[in-house]
Amino acid sequence: MGIAYYNLNNRREALNDYKILVSQYPNSPEAEDALDNVKTIYIEESKPNEYADFMRQAGRPLSMDAEDSLTYAAAKTQYDNGNTNAALNAFNSYLQKFPDGVYAIEADFNRAEIYNGKKDWNNALRAYEAVAADAPNVYAERAVLAASRIYFFELKNYEKAEKYYQQLKDLTTNNENKLEAMRGLLRCQYQLQQWTEALANAKDLADAKGSSTDDKALANMTIGKSYQVNNQYDLAISNFKLVVQNNKAALAAEARYEIAACWFAVNKLSDAEKAAFETINKSGSYDFWVGKSYILLGDIYFKQKDYFNAKATYQSIINNTINNDLKNEAQAKLNKVIDEEANSSKVNN
């Protein structure tokens, strides 16, 4: 009768019949079959603890390993059937009971996937990071990739994203994931202005098979920045010029400005002025870099003791920009020009 009830989806009656059979004929072949069917029902209903209790009462207590496997199987059944809320509760119960269980890594990964699907980023990350911390394992690469993306795209936490993109780069043998790791790592280092630290990875990305034109532009920009902060201006300018060749958007505007800044740093003021005007004329839709270029022109005039044009240039930024950082920078420099001009007049008088 138990089988008939089960086929009719009447699990309660099926369980009762199986339990009676086990109780009355514990050593019969039929009892063994009944025990298997009881196990199936409890797993399908995600009630592993009740099954363990039943087996103890039947005089057949489960081993710790068997209970571990059973508890996980119940959770996985819910997950495979798309019952994500029930699966999540079951995975959490499994990990609470078996934190170092045979399936702990798999349970953490599966619950991370559920949390990720719900956009519960913090809980997803806790689970993904637990899997990543136990690398190498079969789920580590996917966990590290997911953690990287959440930190970078959703939370804008570039320090954490950098950590996991680096781990992904070290872990993966998949070319697509390797490219994403290098690209993500470089974007993090760019946001964090870690120019010197980014140099090796930027060169890797620039030379990587399958890297895009945008990848190469960002890599060359970063390489240029690395040389620039280390006062290797010729090498910096060479890489910034490669950016201009490979990119027609914001990176090109920034690269043009940085070329001008490098010329200014080595006191080649004519070249700096020419490069600043090139930024203004060829990247006119990028207000920030146009503003920075005008400020640099003011710096050039100031260095040449051309106080009139320096003041006029800084004042034009103050009057026209909506960027408060640029406005404040121009105002501070204008004040210096006014002070120096006043002091110069006193000396001449």
Residue ranges and their predicted role:
Residues 1-349:
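Acidic, polar-rich low-complexity tracts and alpha-helical solenoid repeat scaffolds
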